[in-house]
C-alpha cells in the first residue's frame, strides 16, 4: 500500500514498486478524465517524456481504449527537436505507448512544426498552444533529473521567454536543441504529478525548497496541488 506524508505543500506518496505506483496514478488519472467528460469539459494534460513514465502511459492506453469516447488533449512538457519517428522523440513515445487510443480517445497538441530550429518555431508553437489548449491543464505529469531539472528547464537556464507559453532550450551536456513549456505555463494546472524513483532523486526533491533549481522554483511558485509519486 502507498504511504502518505506531507512535504511542505507537496504530498509525498511512497510505493513499494513502480507497478503499484502506476496502478494508483492511472486510476487517479481516469477519474479526472471521467469527471471532465461528465461536465462536458476538455481534459488536457501535459506529459513528461523518457523511459520512466512509459509504463504509466501504456496502462493509461488500456484504460482509455475501454472508453467509448473521451475528449482528451495531450501535449508534451518538452520535446527534442527531432522527427517524431526518432527514438528520442517524446511525442513519438506517446503515440507508441498510447497506440490503441490515439486519434480516438485522445489527440496530440504538438510542440513541433517544420521549422529547422525551436527558436524559429517558438511563436507559432505558442499560438498553437494558446488556441488549442484550455487555459489550465487538468494535470501535468513531470519527471525530474538528478540535477533538479524538470521538462527542459535546466539549472541556470531561463524558465520562460518573452511571456510565451514555450521556449527553446539546450541540454547542458549533449547540447541537443529542445522546446519546453515555460514554467508559468506548467504551473497553469489544477494538479502536478511528480514521478521520481530512487533515493538520489528523493534527496534532491527533499532539498529543493532551499535551492534555486528548477524543481525548487516549481515548488515555491505552485498554487496547485502537488503529488509526488515515488518508489525505490
Task: For each feature predicted by the language model, list its residue ranges.
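Glycine-rich beta-strand-to-loop/alpha-helix junction loops that act as flexible
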Residues: 47-52, 142-146, 197
Amino acid at each position: 500500500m502507498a504511504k502518505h506524508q506531507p512535504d511542505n505543500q507537496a504530498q509525498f506518496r511512497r510505493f513499494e514498486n513502480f507497478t503499484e505506483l502506476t496502478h494508483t496514478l492511472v486510476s487517479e488519472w481516469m477519474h479526472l478524465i471521467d469527471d471532465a467528460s461528465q461536465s462536458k469539459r476538455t481534459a488536457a494534460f501535459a506529459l513528461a517524456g523518457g523511459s520512466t513514465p512509459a509504463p504509466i502511459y501504456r496502462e493509461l492506453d488500456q484504460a482509455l481504449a475501454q472508453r467509448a469516447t473521451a475528449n482528451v488533449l495531450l501535449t508534451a512538457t518538452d520535446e527534442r527537436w527531432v522527427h517524431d519517428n526518432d527514438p528520442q522523440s517524446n511525442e513519438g513515445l506517446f503515440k507508441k505507448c498510447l497506440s490503441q487510443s490515439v486519434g480516438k480517445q485522445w489527440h496530440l497538441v504538438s510542440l513541433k512544426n517544420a521549422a529547422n530550429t525551436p527558436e524559429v518555431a517558438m511563436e507559432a508553437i505558442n499560438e498553437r498552444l494558446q488556441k488549442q489548449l484550455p487555459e489550465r491543464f487538468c494535470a501535468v505529469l513531470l519527471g525530474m533529473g538528478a540535477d533538479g531539472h524538470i521538462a527542459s528547464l535546466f539549472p541556470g537556464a531561463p524558465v520562460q521567454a518573452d511571456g510565451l507559453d514555450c521556449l527553446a532550450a539546450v541540454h547542458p551536456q549533449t547540447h541537443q536543441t529542445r522546446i519546453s513549456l515555460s514554467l508559468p505555463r506548467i504551473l497553469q494546472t489544477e494538479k502536478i504529478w511528480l514521478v521520481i524513483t530512487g533515493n538520489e532523486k528523493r534527496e534532491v526533491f527533499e532539498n529543493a525548497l532551499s535551492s534555486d533549481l528548477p524543481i525548487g522554483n516549481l515548488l515555491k511558485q505552485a498554487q496547485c496541488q502537488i503529488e509526488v509519486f515515488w518508489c525505490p
